Curated annotation (Swiss-Prot):
During the asexual blood stage, catalyzes the cleavage of denatured host hemoglobin (Hb) or globins. Digestion of host Hb is an essential step which provides the parasite with amino acids for protein synthesis, and regulates osmolarity. One of its GO terms (cellular component) is membrane. Its EC number is 3.4.23.39. It comes from Plasmodium falciparum (isolate 3D7). This is Plasmepsin III. InterPro entries: Aspartic_peptidase_A1 (IPR001461), Pepsin-like_dom (IPR034164), PEPTIDASE_A1 (IPR033121), Peptidase_aspartic_dom_sf (IPR021109).
Length: 451
C-alpha cells in the first residue's frame, strides 16, 4: 500500500499543530502569570502582616520606654539632654576580637578551674597585653558654641572642671576628624588668648582661653572655655572615639584658670534657680544616659532622695564606710565619676576580697572574671550614718556571652588613687539616680526607675 502525503495535508496538519501549540502556550502563560500573581500577592500580604506585627511590637514594647523618657524631657520644667555611652564591655569585645583572644581566655579559665594556673602567676603591672582604658566610659552628648550653634560631642565628666574643644587652629593629626570651633563665625565670641598647657601620663594638650555662648539643651550663657590648638598623645583613644572635647561638671578648685563651673555660671546669670544637676542612667539601657540641669526631675527615680555631705570642694567626694564580705574600709574617700565604667577599689582591698571569692585574673590581661553563678560573691555596701547603698553581684557582673556563656566579667577593678579612695562609676549609677548640688555641697542618691 502506497502512502501519499500531499503538500496541502502537511500544511493543514502543521497549521493545526501550530494552533494547538499556540493555544497550549497561551494557556501555560496564563497559568504561569496567575501563579506569579498569587506569589506576589502572598509575599505582599506576608510583608504587610509581618510589618504590622513588628510595628506593634516595637511601638508597644521596644519604643514604649523611649516614649516615656521623651515625654518626661518634653514636659519637664528643667533642661534635660540625652547622651550616648560607650562602656568598657563594648571596648572589651572589640579588643578581644582584634587580638583574637577569645579562645585564649576560655583556655585560661579551664586551666584555672583544674588548678593548673596559680593566682600568684596571673600577671602584674608588667602585663604586656592591656585592655585599653577598661575603666573608662565615654558619656558623650551634644552642646553648642557660639551664636551660630557650632555643634560638638562632649564627654560629660563629673571629675573635670573645664570645657575643652578642638580649635580650627589645631595643627595635630588627631584633630583632623573632629568638629572644630571657629571663632570667626560667631558674633558672640570674646577674645582672651591666655595660653593653656595640660600635661599628663597620657599626653599633652596646648590651647588658649576663649569666651563665647555655650548652650546645652534649652540653656545658654557666655562662658570661658579652652580651644585646643595642639594635642600630643592620647592615642588611639581620642582620634578613634566619637568625642570632640570634654565638658567638665566638677568644682572650681579643680579647674585650670579658676573658672566657675558652667552650672554655677547659669545660676549667677539667672538662667536657673538652683546650681544643681542630676544624672539618670536607665538600668536596662547601657548605651544611654540623661543629664538634667537646674533642678531634680522626680520622674526619674523612686523613693526618697538621700543626701551625703561632700568632704571637700575639689571632687564630688564623700566619706562612706565600704564593706565587701569580710573586707571593710572605714571612712573611705568615695568619688562619683561619670567617666568611669566600673567600680574601683584600692589594690589591697581588692586582693583580700579575691582570695576568698573565686575571682580569676586572665594572665597578661587587665581582666577579672568569675562564673556568673558564683555564690561566694557578696553584696558591696557603702554605709553612711543614715543610709546603706548596695550593689548585688548581678549589678557588678557583666556576662561574657560572646566568649563563654557561664563566664562573667567583674566590674570591680583594683586602681590605686589617693589613700583609701574608691570610685563609683557606671554600675552604681545604673542603680542609683545621682544629684550634684553646688549650692548645698552635697550629692544625692535615690533608686533609679527602670524607664
Amino acid at each position: 500500500m502506497n502512502l501519499t502525503i500531499k503538500e496541502e495535508d502537511f500544511t493543514n496538519t502543521f497549521m493545526k499543530n501550530e494552533e494547538s501549540f499556540n493555544t497550549f502556550r497561551v494557556t501555560k502563560v496564563k497559568r504561569w502569570n496567575a501563579k506569579r500573581l498569587f506569589k506576589i500577592l502572598f509575599v505582599t500580604v506576608f510583608i504587610v502582616l509581618a510589618g504590622g506585627f513588628s510595628y506593634y511590637i516595637f511601638e508597644n514594647f521596644v519604643f514604649q520606654k523611649n516614649r516615656k523618657i521623651n515625654h518626661i524631657i518634653k514636659t519637664s520644667k528643667y533642661s534635660t539632654v540625652g547622651f550616648n555611652i560607650e562602656n568598657s564591655y563594648d571596648r572589651l569585645m572589640k579588643t578581644i576580637k582584634e587580638h583574637k583572644l577569645k579562645n585564649y581566655i576560655k583556655e585560661s579559665v579551664k586551666l584555672f578551674n583544674k588548678g593548673l594556673t596559680k593566682k600568684s602567676y596571673l600577671g602584674s603591672e608588667f602585663d604586656n597585653v592591656e585592655l585599653k582604658d577598661l575603666a573608662n566610659v565615654l558619656s558623650f552628648g551634644e552642646a553648642k558654641l557660639g551664636d551660630n550653634g557650632q555643634k560638638f560631642n562632649f564627654l560629660f565628666h563629673t571629675a573635670s572642671s573645664n570645657v575643652w574643644v578642638p580649635s580650627i587652629k589645631c595643627t595635630s593629626e588627631s584633630c583632623e576628624s573632629k568638629n572644630h570651633y571657629d571663632s570667626s563665625k560667631s558674633k558672640t565670641y570674646e577674645k582672651d588668648d591666655t595660653p593653656v598647657k595640660l600635661t599628663s601620663k597620657a599626653g599633652t594638650i596646648s590651647g588658649i582661653f576663649s569666651k563665647d555662648l555655650v548652650t546645652i539643651g534649652k540653656l545658654s550663657v557666655p562662658y570661658k572655655f579652652i580651644e585646643m590648638t595642639e594635642i600630643v598623645g592620647f592615642e588611639p583613644f581620642y582620634s578613634e572615639s566619637d568625642v570632640d572635647g570634654v565638658f567638665g561638671l566638677g568644682w572650681k578648685d579643680l579647674s585650670i584658670g579658676s573658672i566657675d563651673p558652667y552650672i554655677v555660671e547659669l545660676k549667677t546669670q539667672n538662667k536657673i534657680e538652683q546650681a544643681v544637676y542630676s544624672i539618670y542612667l536607665p538600668p536596662e539601657n547601657k548605651n544611654k544616659g540623661y543629664l538634667t540641669i537646674g533642678g531634680i526631675e522626680e520622674r526619674f527615680f523612686d523613693g526618697p532622695l538621700n543626701y551625703e555631705k561632700l568632704n571637700h570642694d575639689l571632687m564630688w567626694q564623700v566619706d562612706l564606710d565600704v564593706h565587701f564580705g569580710n573586707v571593710s574600709s572605714k571612712k573611705a574617700n568615695v568619688i562619683l565619676d561619670s567617666a568611669t565604667s566600673v567600680i574601683t577599689v584600692p589594690t589591697e582591698f581588692f586582693n583580700q576580697f579575691v582570695e576568698s571569692a573565686s575571682v580569676f585574673k586572665v594572665p597578661f590581661l587587665s581582666l577579672y572574671v568569675t562564673t556568673c553563678g558564683n555564690t561566694k560573691l557578696p553584696t558591696l555596701e557603702y554605709r553612711s550614718p543614715n543610709k546603706v547603698y548596695t550593689l548585688e553581684p548581678k549589678q557588678y557582673l557583666e556576662p561574657l556571652e560572646n566568649i563563654f556563656s557561664a563566664l562573667c566579667m567583674l566590674n570591680i577593678v583594683p586602681i590605686d588613687l589617693e589613700k583609701n579612695t574608691f570610685v563609683l562609676g557606671d554600675p552604681f549609677m545604673r542603680k542609683y539616680f545621682t544629684v550634684y548640688d553646688y549650692d548645698n555641697h552635697t550629692v544625692g542618691f535615690a533608686l533609679a526607675k527602670n524607664l
